[in-house]
């Protein structure tokens, strides 16, 4: 294990085969050229120069102000504003952070990833990088850092987000049902304080686009035939098993993952579509009506609703299957589409 030098000591390793520690004793080397630590690691330019650091990724509430010194002007820097709280959205930044580290290492730069204390936010980012580059499950990557630094302990929210990252194949796929459900849950945590709902939360109204993806299914109001949503908006879930299926508000990665629609589910749970926006603002729950004929299609509840299979979905935008018809969209003559 590494020993941080005392006030009058030089750089020493208690084990010559162990990873190096900087002379400042404020950063640990995870692998050649990759360090993590706290705010003290960037307090003095000399600390960075001694360790050969030429790229710094900061994950903190404030961006550090680097003192002038040799090499500071040439530093690669990336700042990700983030509090060390379970509700902080770190997942949406992971691809950018992992790419920054990867590019810096590819160009021969040594990288420091730091937060304030060097135990949670920076640990989460380094864990994501190890997961991606070494194709490691969350637990194995996290364990590597805890061996290096036993006090390393990311909050439970970051743990959950990294498990979602793993479930998405080590990349943030914004089109996946997992990410869409995650994004909805993050909005729910702030609702109803939000004055406006983020526009990226809503799927495009299918009446505003003429074509869909290959093999997509279009769902129409059974009464008036108005197009309502596409199959890509359906958020699949695993079958529930009684009260335990909705004992926890937050869905786990395993409950978000499924290989197909559940036949026993009598409703589709979908992401919000643009035509729903006026009905959702300022209220916690209500009915979902067809925007054309006002036929009742289903309901929504930001606190969640139980599916007929037993799974609790939060938040819930539920369309009853017996209120809509499926229309398969198939490509015809290249750019045209046909419906069957």
Swiss-Prot record:
Cofactor list: Zn(2+)
N-acetylmethionine modifications at: 1
Residues the record lists as binding substrate: 116-121
Group of enzyme by EC: hydrolase
GO molecular function, one term: protein serine/threonine phosphatase activity
Positions of modified residues (Phosphoserine): 335
Entry keyword annotation includes Ligase: no
One GO CC annotation: cytoplasm
Highest taxon of source: Eukaryota
Tissues where the protein occurs: Ubiquitous, highest expression in spleen, testis, ovary, and peripheral blood leukocytes and lower expression in liver and lung.
UniProt cross-references to InterPro entries, sorted A to Z: Dual-sp_phosphatase_cat-dom, DUSP12, Prot-tyrosine_phosphatase-like, Tyr_Pase_dom, TYR_PHOSPHATASE_DUAL_dom, Znf_C2H2_type
Free-text comment on the cofactor: Binds 2 Zn(2+) ions per subunit.
Chief site of localization: nucleus
Record-listed E.C. numbers: 3.1.3.16, 3.1.3.48
Family in the record: Belongs to the protein-tyrosine phosphatase family. Non-receptor class dual specificity subfamily.
Subunit structure, interactors included: Monomer.
Protein name: Dual specificity protein phosphatase 12
Organism, as annotated: Homo sapiens (Human)
